[in-house]
Structure formats: C-alpha cells, structure tokens
Amino acid sequence: PEAVIVATARSPIGRAMKGSLKDIRPDDLSAQVLTDLMSKVPAVTPDHIDDLLMGCGQPAGESGHNIGRATAVLLGWNQVPGVTVNRYCSSSLMTIRMAAHAIKAGEGDCFVAAGVETVSRYVHGMADGPHNPTFEEAEARTAKMAEGNEADWAPHDNLPDVYIAMGQTAENVAEYKQVSRE
C-alpha cells in the first residue's frame, strides 16, 4: 500500500515565555491543532484512526504521561491508542516516518502523525538535566560560534556538540551548504 499525507495543520509559531501560546498546556495545544486537522478531512472519523503518533522533544512535566494517548483522550478518541516518540527536534518527522512504515507493512490504514513542543511550559517540568562534562569543550565551541566572532562553521574532527539547539544546527548547515533564505 502507498502512504499519503491527506491533511496538515499546525499552531502559530510562538515566542517562548512571552508569546500568545505561553499559557496553553502542550496536551491542550495538540488537541486544538488536531481538531483543526480533522476538520479538513471530514470523511475521516476517529473510528478510522489506527494510532496517534505524537512526537515530543521533552516528554516530561506537562508533556509527560504519554502525551500521544493523553491528546487522544482529550479529543474524545478513547478507542484510539497513542504513543509518544522522542527524537528531540525531529520527533514529529519520525512520527511521519513511523506512520508511513506502518501503512506499508499493512499494520493499518490511517494514522495521525503529529508533534508538540511548548518551551514556555518547561518550567512545569522537563526531562533534560545536567549535561555530560565530556561535551563541555564542544558546547563552548558552539557558544563561541553563536557569538559570531569565529570563522565560518565547517565539519571538524572534534567531538560534536550533542546539545546544540536545532535552530543553531539549521544555521550551521545552511551556511555550510550555502542555502539562502530566499
């Protein structure tokens, strides 16, 4: 079977700690977005959905307790199982891949692949604790690069910074591969 995306939805991009989304819990936010998603495909009902795959980079605090399943329940999809996938910044991309694989394997026909992250709500609990001291030099290198006082970013043989923010990674790759914003 072929896997296809039939509809998409997303929230506006918020401003961490001060934007219009800062007071919305991640489970409530994901339920709002999925309500919008389902309105775009009225022929699809919760009875058609084989699974809700929810990507979440910080599945703790308000995003904990299997936010995939919690979102399904908030939507009234009590018969729909849910799973939380953690692959940090690419968690929601992983859910799309998982849904496509499940369809191709014949495990189901209809999956909701989603993702949620509410940085403003991290004060209510998060999973990341202290960083491993082994990466201190790499983190310092990233911080120095972020100041803009260093040469252009390029791959190197040093230990990579496993804690680098996705936005900084995107900037580095765009610079290295000469990808414009146009």
Stretches with model-predicted labels:
Residues 1-3, 15-46, 61-65, 72-182:
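Acyl-thioester C-C bond-transforming condensing/cleaving domain
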Residues 8-13:
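Short polar catalytic/cofactor-binding loops
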Residues 47-55:
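Short glycine-rich phosphate-binding loop at a beta-alpha junction
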Residues 54-62:
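A glycine-/small-polar-enriched, mobile loop at the entrance of the PLP active site in fold-type I
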